Structures are given as C-alpha cells and as structure tokens.
UniProtKB/Swiss-Prot annotation:
Membership in a protein family: In the N-terminal section; belongs to the FAD-binding oxidoreductase type 6 family.
Quaternary data: The system is probably composed of an oxygenase subunit (Stc2) and two reductase subunits (Stc3 and Stc4).
FAD-binding FR-type domain span: 11-114
Name of this protein: Stachydrine N-demethylase reductase subunit Stc4
InterPro entries: 2Fe-2S_ferredoxin-like_sf, 2Fe-2S_ferredoxin-type, 2Fe2S_fd_BS, Beta-grasp_dom_sf, Cbr1-like_FAD-bd_dom, FAD-bd_FR_type, FNR_nucleotide-bd, MRET
Record text on cofactor binding: Binds 1 FAD per subunit.
Obligatory cofactor(s): FAD; [2Fe-2S] cluster
Molecular-function GO term, any one: oxidoreductase activity
Length: 353
C-alpha cells in the first residue's frame, strides 16, 4: 500500500500512472490512475481532464470526465468507451496498461452539483454520459448523509449500461438513490422488466413524479440532450435549474474583443510564441492554434471549440478576438489567458507557448 508521508494534492505538472484497468461493458474500460509521488486528487465531482495520448502519429489530446469522486482521493478513474471510428479511445483500450505514465491537463469544468446545491436531484444521461452522474452520486453517497437522487440512464441494451454494478451496489445500501434504466432493446435470450424505448415525457412522469422540484443534470449525445430539454420545457420545468455537459459547441461568449476591430481575412497578423522562440505571420481570421500547428508547434488541445479549456495559454502582448463556449473563466481572462483554439490575433500578439 502506498504510504503518504505528507498530504499533498496532485497537479498536472506531474504525470498520471495507470495502476488498474477494469472492463465495464463491450468496448468500455475504466482506467485507474495514481500520482507517482503519492499525491492525492482534489477535484469537483463531474469535472474532466484532458489526456495526452502518445499515439504513433503524434500526441492526441482527448477530454474525459472523471468517473471517480473526490471523496476517494487516492486514485483518479476515467471510464471510456471506444466508438466506431474513434482513435484516441481505441488507442487507450489497445495500448494503455498498468505501469504506463501519461500526461494529463486539468481538472476543469463547471458541470457539478458543487455549484448547484439542492435538496433533490434528477440525473438524466445516455451512454457514456453516465460518468459524471456516477461521480456526483458517489460523492453524495460518501458524504454520510442520505441523498435524494433519481438516476436515469439510457442505453441500447442492458449489457451496455456503463458502471451499472457500481450504481446498483450504492443503491442497495441506502434508499436515497432511485435507479431507472431505459434500454432500446433487451439482450438476446435475456428477459428485461425495466423501461424500454426512447426517453420521453411519459417516462419522465413515471420515473420522477416530482421532477418539477428537482435540480436536473443531463449528459449524453446532443440529440438526446435536446430531447430532454424539449421534454422538460414542454412540461413547464424551470429551465434555469437545468444543467448539461456537452462537448459540442453552443453559441459562444465573446471575450477580449475590441469594439472597433473585427478580424479581416485580408489583414495579416504576427504571433510571437515566446517560449518556443518562434514568430509567424498569418491572417487575422486564423486561430492561434492553427497558426501554431502551421509553424510546427504543439499547443495541447482537445475539443477545438472553446469548451474543454485544454488549449489555454497566457497572452502577454496584443489583442485577440476570442469567442468561446465556456472553456475559460472570467478570472482567467482577467489574468491574461486565452483559448488558442478560438482566439484570432489582431495585428501583433505574443503568447507563452
């Protein structure tokens, strides 16, 4: 067992070491990581990290929700599902084994009950969108107080419900976790007595009759979340109490945008990458991330839509036109940080990269 001589918290300056990998469902594996120094993990339940995966063609940056809770700080777990055509997750399933060390960036994200405390919760998820819900439910379970959570997860088949055993174990110990599984079809040659079909308003009323009184958290593919939003709004739910996690872009937030200056494709800009000693020219409509790649530099990035915050760098000179989707805080912007993936240089800009 790891001995902790002094309590300290992990930071992303230190790599993560894979200590176990656990199969969960078809093409789904939970990877458990520890800090080589023995540092503990401190994060909000529901947050994510971005992993730098050393793939043969060059590093890949992929963002994954932390499926463990901060109430269990000796390890950080990530539960991933390899989709058709996926490269990063498939690389993890095929190549990431016990003893390997990889770089991680984070934790980050505001999708957490920490920011929206309530007496009663309704967690609605589909597929791998279950992972932040598991983390938040585990944190409530570990708090020592009985929670009030209706936990709905939708999957194609019962065998594809991710982390089902973990959730059913917690639900078997206390009465405050009410699990509702919804599948499109049963597994061959296996009976299924739970809900079947696509999530809809009728199911919602049956599974959580007091949904109007609950704080709602939703995570899953965008079509699924859109259906949930429309169902709740159509039933008169107060949508200010609805929260969702998504890695697809929504209308952006403009930051650090001079009122009288707009990027022009005909105008040239100059970007100085101070740490690399490289200066390059580009159009004002190119992003700083694209300019860095064209110059042969690597700025870690994940979603490339201003959501995950992986490409955050400090701007030391000049102005940029940045339109993001929640991947950077107002405090970071005030401190001079920008997101390279959605920041366009105006005239001359210098960044620490």
């Amino acid at each position: 067992m790891t001995q902790f001589k002094q309590l300290s918290f992990w930071s992303d300056a230190e790599p993560l070491e894979c200590v176990t990998r656990t199969p969960e469902a078809p093409n789904v594996v939970t990877f458990s990581f520890q800090s080589p120094s023995g540092a503990l993990f401190n994060h909000d339940p529901g947050q994510f990290v971005t992993l730098e995966l050393p793939a043969p063609g060059g590093p890949l940056y992929r963002t994954y929700t932390i499926s463990s809770a901060p109430s269990r700080p000796t390890a950080l777990t990530i539960t991933v599902k390899a989709q058709d055509g996926s490269t990063g997750t498939r690389w993890m399933l095929d190549n990431l084994h016990k003893g390997m060390r990889i770089r991680a960036i984070g934790p980050a994200g505001k999708f957490s009950i920490v920011h929206h405390p309530a007496d009663k919760y309704l967690f609605i998820s589909a597929g791998s969108g279950i992972t932040p819900m598991v983390a938040m439910t585990t944190w409530l379970y570990d708090s020592g107080r009985e929670p009030d959570v209706v936990f709905i997860n939708c999957a194609r088949r019962p065998s594809e419900i991710i982390l089902r055993d973990r959730m059913e174990l917690m639900a078997s110990r206390i009465v405050g976790i009410d699990l509702k599984w919804v599948v499109e079809e049963p597994d061959p040659f296996r009976s299924w007595t739970g809900y079947r079909g696509m999530f809809n308003q009728i199911m919602l009323g049956l599974m959580a009759q007091d949904y109007l009184e609950r704080e709602v958290f939703c995570c899953g593919p965008e079509p699924f979340m859109r259906a949930v939003r429309e169902a709740l709004a159509g039933l008169g739910y107060d949508m200010s109490r609805y929260h969702q996690e998504s890695f697809t872009a929504e209308p952006g937030h403009a930051e650090d945008v001079p009122e009288d200056v707009i990027p022009d494709e005909q105008n040239h800009a100059e970007i100085a990458f101070a740490l690399s000693g490289v200066t390059t020219r580009c159009s004002e409509t190119d992003t700083i991330l694209a300019a860095a790649k064209a110059a042969g530099l690597v700025i870690p990035s994940g979603c490339s839509m201003g959501i995950c915050g992986t490409c955050k760098v400090r701007k030391t000179e000049g102005q940029v036109h940045m339109v993001h989707n929640g991947g950077i805080t107002d405090e970071d912007v005030e401190d001079g940080y920008i997101l390279a993936c959605c920041s366009k240089p105006l005239r001359r800009v210098s960044v620490e990269a």
